Amino acid sequence: MTRLERRLLIWRENFSGSFSAKVRWRMKHDRNPLLVTVQDKYLVRQWAHARGVETVPLLQMAEDADAFPIETLPPDCFVKASHGCGWNLLRREGVFYEFGNGTAFVDDHGLPQPAAALAARRVDDAACRALWRKWLGQKYLAAEWAYQLMTPRLLAEPVMAQRGNGPQRLYRLFTMQGVVQAIAVGGPVFVRTESDYLVFDRNWTRIRMPGEHPPVDEAVLGERPQTLPDMLEIARRLGSELDFVRIDLFDTPQGAILNEMTVYPSGGQPGRPFVSATHNRWLGRLWKLPGRTRR
């Protein structure tokens, strides 16, 4: 996309009230302090627990990289920053790796890659601490207001298993005032195979879009989760106090578990979250911004 094409797309989205235009409006204008709480990967835990929602367990937390004890971490876990996006490491069999978006860690069917295939992403303990110091000394993108008010922290979390031991999926619930309007199923295998989200309504009816490229294993990856009623209830509890929030859940053997909440999906980039501009406008028009009736 050229710079001119991008500017034209943003203009069209702003004019039509498309979803990304609403995200950009929130980034610029909305200073609701609750946005900070739910976006913070540490604070959102106690906020969710107070509403009866289980989260990914917290193994360790520290505000100082040198106070984060590697020797007490389990051999398999994630270490991430609470105040940013994409700042994460995977520890597997006692070895740290740069995780990124996870695509290097799965094959084209979403199954784990052997350790030999990950050698280029390996990070030793000293490099880990250097990364952690870097993260703790940074603020995430200035345009995303909520991040600027967060206390930098390091978190350790267990690796969550997918119910049924299939490829791990993340269920992104686009929630308006507690009502789920769309569910986008994704995960590392989608990015690896350059596939689009599988999108469903709250009843798990597939929302097909022109130009979409679903994954080859669509039948498996798009299987209706047994915990769908629980997911919708979680979204009601966590989303009812906000005009919009994306609630990201895992479907685990222990049930539906909150991974995180997102108030600025894709950072307001144009042409998101779906491949179809028509559906992006549809989703945007369902989002009623505070003090506004249409846009």
Regions found by a protein language model. Give the residues of each.
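Short, solvent-exposed loop/turn elements at beta->coil junctions and helix N-caps
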Residues: A62-A67, V159-R163, F250
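Phosphate-binding site of ATP-dependent enzymes
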Residues: V106-H213
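C-terminal active-site "lid" helix and adjoining low-complexity regulatory extension at the edge
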Residues: G17, Q226, E233, D251-R295
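A conserved helix-loop-beta module that forms one wall/lid of the active-site cleft
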Residues: S20-D125, R129-A130, Q138-A143
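Membrane-proximal basic amphipathic "stem/tether" segments
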Residues: M1-N32, R295
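Phosphate-binding core of ATP-grasp and ATP-grasp-like enzymes
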Residues: H83, W87-V95, G164-I207, M231-R246, ...
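A long amphipathic alpha-helix within ATP-dependent nucleotide-binding catalytic cores
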Residues: A143-P158, D196-A256
